[in-house]
From Swiss-Prot:
Protein name from the UniProt record: GTP cyclohydrolase FolE2
Organism: Pseudomonas aeruginosa (strain ATCC 15692 / DSM 22644 / CIP 104116 / JCM 14847 / LMG 12228 / 1C / PRS 101 / PAO1)
Molecular function via GO: GTP cyclohydrolase activity; GTP cyclohydrolase I activity
Swiss-Prot/TrEMBL catalytic activity: GTP + H2O = 7,8-dihydroneopterin 3'-triphosphate + formate + H(+)
Task of the protein: Converts GTP to 7,8-dihydroneopterin triphosphate.
InterPro entries, sorted: GTP_cyclohydrolase_FolE2, GTP_cyclohydrolase_FolE2/MptA
Amino acid sequence: MNALTLPDIARQTTTADLPLDWVGMQGIALPVQIGGQRVAAEADAGVSLDDPQARGIHMSRLYLALAELEQGELDLSCLRAVLQRFLDSHAGLSRRAYLRLRLAPLLRRPALVSPLSGWKRYPLVLDTRLEGDDFQAEVHLELTYSSTCPCSAALARQLIQERFDQDFAGQPLDHASVLAWLGSSAGIVATPHSQRSSAHLRIGLAEDCIGLPLEELADLGESALGTAVQTAVKRADEQAFALANGQNLMFCEDAVRRLHRALQGYPQASRFSIRVVHAESLHAHDAVAESHWQRGAA
């Protein structure tokens, strides 16, 4: 008995006569290796459908090509190779290939003072695109930090001054008494409000960039902000964090400018956009600021 030939409906033509910008799959589970870690990722893979007579693409070919990403350390060269396989397997049908990876690798971060350290998650999206020889890669990275309101800090200082005036008016100042007062809740009657905040970085990588500079970008951004959220801490670390917040008072405008200046000096960035969100503890709404830049633009 002769085996039946399985039908390939995707090879059929259509009378619709309409090319499509993107056709593919979303949310494909995939293990990848980044920074020596095995990380669970989700992939969106697709190509353009430029032949207006073609009914569809061959999605299984895209799915199978993704297996190449499991073989070694994830970098831009292997991402480009996968995109090229997308196009090679759709010769005559597609001119553009797209791949997006969503993952959340862990970085071990040291405490500020003590020898402790702990793991911190960094939500990451990698967007890549290939058309002919034009390969583009963009990193979306989220950083979490603490922001203390400069206005609230000034108001708190004023209240402390007023209480000091009330408690010591007309009295000779004694060093020991003042020192004890400064260390008491009776003296420090107000503290500024602060909140956990987030910076969303979208960075276009330069053509000569090969590796994925996750740790470099995290270090660069957190150093610019000065108040990255911590992992394992002792009391000495918590005190150092309080000092860092006091020395890095920030409105959302201040935070986005710090990040903008830092990324402008990063040679592997060809362009970027930044969005910072301060989840206000004073208000029921967020404070937001944005900035963008492109190398060579006026």
